[in-house]
Amino acid sequence: MTINILKKANGVKRVFAAVLAVTTLVSVAACGSDSTSASLDSNSGKTTKITVGVCPGPYGDMVEKVIGPLLKDDGFELKTKLFNDYVQPDKALASGSIQANLMQHINYLNKFTKDNNLDLTSLGQVPTLGLGIYSKKYQSIDDIEDGSTVSIAADGSNLARSLGVLEQQGLVTLKGDIDSTKASVNDIASNPKNLKIKTLDAAQLARSVDTVDVALVPGNFAWAAGLKPAEALATEQQDEGVINVFVVNTKDVDSDFGKAVKKLLTSQEFKGAIAKSDFKDFGKPTTW
């Protein structure tokens, strides 16, 4: 009997110890969660490190050479993480593996967050290198021949954007009763040169210049591939929807970091730094 009682007592102790261990782990995890949610606030004179997701192109340089140095006095140290497509930077931001990104325009952000149920918000616009029409076969828009193959981005917002640029140049006409930010190939009402539209992942468009007659390449991928804007047959007429934006999780908009970035992006200090940088000829934010 005594042995059974001791066994039961020892069993109770083991159960209690296990429960205590689990409780401790939960408490630690909760504390860790609180720390993460506050991680974008400045920290009593210490430097807060921020990882910004970027895609190939100029915006990683913009973060490292202009935005980062200007935020140093606010207590933030920015570094970039490179992604090779437009999908992963927003997913990484939503998951918390990065704290911000700079790689997309507002039309793309709005559509992607809606389609993927993400809670991300723009802090403001940055100077943006527009989409260009590139060709190794033709020297001008007027040279484009009947039946030419034209590559454009496959993702919804950039596909619509590319069709809009083709329409700006008189190469196609879109249906009049559609939302131009959601246009698809099926919304082409008139295609007088019988262009063959080929949709590709945006990251492949710069390489496609070698294999198609004409390619519409977003500015960041054109920059990364060494395609110069001056060599484009034409560039898009930018509006607010296609100006790139600096993005964070919505919960971080009012953090110290969110407030500092939002203030910086419309400041004379930022405008002056851009004017002296490699980005001086980019399309300017509509907020300037």
Language model segments and positions:
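A conserved helix-loop-strand patch within extracytoplasmic ligand-binding domains
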Residues: L123-V172, K271-G272
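C-terminal motif of bacterial Sec signal peptides marking the signal peptidase cleavage site
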Residues: T24-A30
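Ligand-binding clefts/hinges and TM-proximal coupling segments of bilobed small-molecule sensing domains
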Residues: S157-K182, K262-W288
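Ligand-binding "clamshell"
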Residues: K111-L123, Y138, T211, L216, ...
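Short, polar/charged alpha-helical segment
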Residues: K49, G57-K79
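Short helix-initiation/N-cap motifs at beta->coil->alpha
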Residues: T80-K91, I178-R207
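A bilobed periplasmic-binding-protein/Venus flytrap-type ligand-binding module shared by bacterial periplasmic
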Residues: G130-I141, V242-F257
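Bacterial signal peptide processing site
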Residues: G32-S35
